[in-house]
Amino acid sequence: MSDFVDRVTVHVKGGDGGNGSAGIRREKYKPLAGPNGGNGGDGGSVVFVADRNATSLLDYRFMPHRVAGSGTMGLGDNKDGSKGEDLILPVPCGTVVFEARGEQGKAKHPGAQLADLRHEGDRCVVAQGGAGGLGNIALANKTRRAPGFALLGELGEERDVILELKSIADVALVGFPSAGKSSLIAAMSSAKPKIADYPFTTLVPNLGVVIAGDSRYTIADVPGLIPGASEGKGLGLEFLRHIERTEIIAHVIDCATLEPDRDPMSDYHALENELALYADKLELPLGAIPIPERPRIVILNKIDVPEAKELAEFVRPEFERLGLKVFEISTASHEGLKELNFALSALVHEMREEVANREQAEEEARVVIKPLETKGRRPRRADEGGSALEFTVERRELGNGEVFFEVRGVKPERWVMQTNFDNDEAVGYLADRLAKLGVEDELRRKGAHPGDEVRIGRGARMVEFDWDPTISAGAEMLDGSNLGARGKDLRLEEQDPRTHRRSNAERRAQYHEMMDARAAVRDAMMAERKAGHWADPTVDDDRHDENSLFGHGESSEDGETEE
């Protein structure tokens, strides 16, 4: 079994975000000192990276399911959860990543192109990790000082992608089966492809590195092509894509073939026709030269056979009239290989400069819009960009006449995933967010009535409930005597004088209050003095006062005290 695999379907999943914590800080003499739950950690992402040390996609055929690490849950004492580890997957340079399309359980076909990893170090995030849920300390504000809930972590992105390897070489050897392409690459480089005297010996592309003086370049031996290859005949479409990256196309023509209706010129035109048909279906990468515009050379092979050498000398002027460079070689005797080697080296050098100039010009012409950086939070995915219409509400009707309302949008669907429906306060918080966004108003405009079924999202992440626009998210959702607005626990407002440290403002207020009380007492005493209460110390208005000037006992009529 060959270890060369150039197309696989991979199921990838980003790590889930960790849940936030709804912790409460505890201090001496104060068991409820406020929220201190930390945020959950973000989930890791699945990233493909072009690596020159990778040569095949074989590993992904036997291990097609790849999952990144999940974030951990937040903890009390304001401790955030750790971030999940990104899953870095190396792929060969020249790998193209496509979105997989097709029904579940059936073979997938390539959809939209996600990335073209042509150069060493090129990266593509194919499955974004979920954001960690916020802890209750992050949800607290002036009006919600003690949230009794936290947000759940988001699920990581999950999808199928198709990886296609398109070999990166400077020169592509194309020709009919048994034209001598594998023998040529073996003679010019250290590659050791399988060589035999029957068609379609080469079943996978072979790459060889050729050295010409101080320069080097790579040659790709593409499996043999036949008429109809652009439509999938033979091994056509399976390997035609390997010439998309090459800068030079070299036609290897067998001048010693004994097949009827075969001659060098007809072989050349048949191959060019297949290349032209295939080129119409291509979407070229940045800086690539269209296949019809790429330089061609013609290699007339097997001239060690006398009849083949005569045929090569006969057809050479016809190729030259087409403006093509022609080389007569023999892979058996190595005749003409040195001239071919240095001619290809010079042509490769010219094409590398032209491709580099094209890439630079096209790169300058592109407008690149980069998202804003987020502080310590998971970056947004490409499908999460904000828009004027952040959600939609549609009235749907089932076949049995039942009606429901479907809410779609990035924010509502994310909020639903973040909500713990076992916590009434969290459900009330979700209701507030949806109402503030305008979902309830839009439901009324669409004709929704209390008790109607509402669905938010689709698929496995859909949430279904009966709409109740009068649901209270206020104090009645809290049990016990410590009633207040949602997210406010009156027990947290109590201050223990043994542990509470007064601020300067509180000290000043208490000082002024004490001084005002003293001033009021002095004013009252002065008023009594002016009224004459202090003129005769023997006079007491209240004879029943035990603390009067007469002391204990009863007073006589003349004011003397009886013992």
Swiss-Prot record:
<feature type="domain" description="Obg">
    <location>
        <begin position="2"/>
        <end position="168"/>
    </location>
</feature>
<dbReference type="InterPro" id="IPR014100">
    <property type="entry name" value="GTP-bd_Obg/CgtA"/>
</dbReference>
<dbReference type="Pfam" id="PF01926">
    <property type="entry name" value="MMR_HSR1"/>
</dbReference>
<dbReference type="GO" id="GO:0000287">
    <property type="term" value="F:magnesium ion binding"/>
</dbReference>
<feature type="binding site">
    <location>
        <begin position="330"/>
        <end position="332"/>
    </location>
    <ligand>
        <name>GTP</name>
    </ligand>
</feature>
<dbReference type="InterPro" id="IPR036346">
    <property type="entry name" value="GTP-bd_prot_GTP1/OBG_C_sf"/>
</dbReference>
<comment type="subunit">
    <text>Monomer.</text>
</comment>
<feature type="binding site">
    <location>
        <position position="202"/>
    </location>
    <ligand>
        <name>Mg(2+)</name>
    </ligand>
</feature>
<keyword id="KW-0460">Magnesium</keyword>
<dbReference type="GO" id="GO:0003924">
    <property type="term" value="F:GTPase activity"/>
</dbReference>
<keyword id="KW-0479">Metal-binding</keyword>
<comment type="similarity">
    <text>Belongs to the TRAFAC class OBG-HflX-like GTPase superfamily. OBG GTPase family.</text>
</comment>
<keyword id="KW-0547">Nucleotide-binding</keyword>
<feature type="binding site">
    <location>
        <begin position="175"/>
        <end position="182"/>
    </location>
    <ligand>
        <name>GTP</name>
    </ligand>
</feature>
<dbReference type="InterPro" id="IPR045086">
    <property type="entry name" value="OBG_GTPase"/>
</dbReference>
<feature type="region of interest" description="Disordered">
    <location>
        <begin position="478"/>
        <end position="509"/>
    </location>
</feature>
<dbReference type="InterPro" id="IPR036726">
    <property type="entry name" value="GTP1_OBG_dom_sf"/>
</dbReference>
<feature type="region of interest" description="Disordered">
    <location>
        <begin position="528"/>
        <end position="563"/>
    </location>
</feature>
<dbReference type="InterPro" id="IPR006169">
    <property type="entry name" value="GTP1_OBG_dom"/>
</dbReference>
<dbReference type="GO" id="GO:0005737">
    <property type="term" value="C:cytoplasm"/>
</dbReference>
<dbReference type="GO" id="GO:0042254">
    <property type="term" value="P:ribosome biogenesis"/>
</dbReference>
<dbReference type="InterPro" id="IPR027417">
    <property type="entry name" value="P-loop_NTPase"/>
</dbReference>
<feature type="domain" description="OCT">
    <location>
        <begin position="383"/>
        <end position="469"/>
    </location>
</feature>
<feature type="binding site">
    <location>
        <position position="182"/>
    </location>
    <ligand>
        <name>Mg(2+)</name>
    </ligand>
</feature>
<dbReference type="InterPro" id="IPR015349">
    <property type="entry name" value="OCT_dom"/>
</dbReference>
<feature type="binding site">
    <location>
        <begin position="200"/>
        <end position="204"/>
    </location>
    <ligand>
        <name>GTP</name>
    </ligand>
</feature>
<keyword id="KW-0963">Cytoplasm</keyword>
<comment type="function">
    <text>An essential GTPase which binds GTP, GDP and possibly (p)ppGpp with moderate affinity, with high nucleotide exchange rates and a fairly low GTP hydrolysis rate. Plays a role in control of the cell cycle, stress response, ribosome biogenesis and in those bacteria that undergo differentiation, in morphogenesis control.</text>
</comment>
<keyword id="KW-0378">Hydrolase</keyword>
<feature type="compositionally biased region" description="Basic and acidic residues">
    <location>
        <begin position="486"/>
        <end position="509"/>
    </location>
</feature>
<feature type="binding site">
    <location>
        <begin position="301"/>
        <end position="304"/>
    </location>
    <ligand>
        <name>GTP</name>
    </ligand>
</feature>
<protein>
    <recommendedName>
        <fullName>GTPase Obg</fullName>
        <ecNumber>3.6.5.-</ecNumber>
    </recommendedName>
</protein>
<feature type="domain" description="OBG-type G">
    <location>
        <begin position="169"/>
        <end position="349"/>
    </location>
</feature>
<keyword id="KW-0342">GTP-binding</keyword>
<dbReference type="InterPro" id="IPR031167">
    <property type="entry name" value="G_OBG"/>
</dbReference>
<dbReference type="InterPro" id="IPR006073">
    <property type="entry name" value="GTP-bd"/>
</dbReference>
<feature type="binding site">
    <location>
        <begin position="221"/>
        <end position="224"/>
    </location>
    <ligand>
        <name>GTP</name>
    </ligand>
</feature>
<dbReference type="Pfam" id="PF01018">
    <property type="entry name" value="GTP1_OBG"/>
</dbReference>
<dbReference type="GO" id="GO:0005525">
    <property type="term" value="F:GTP binding"/>
</dbReference>
<dbReference type="InterPro" id="IPR006074">
    <property type="entry name" value="GTP1-OBG_CS"/>
</dbReference>
<dbReference type="Pfam" id="PF09269">
    <property type="entry name" value="DUF1967"/>
</dbReference>
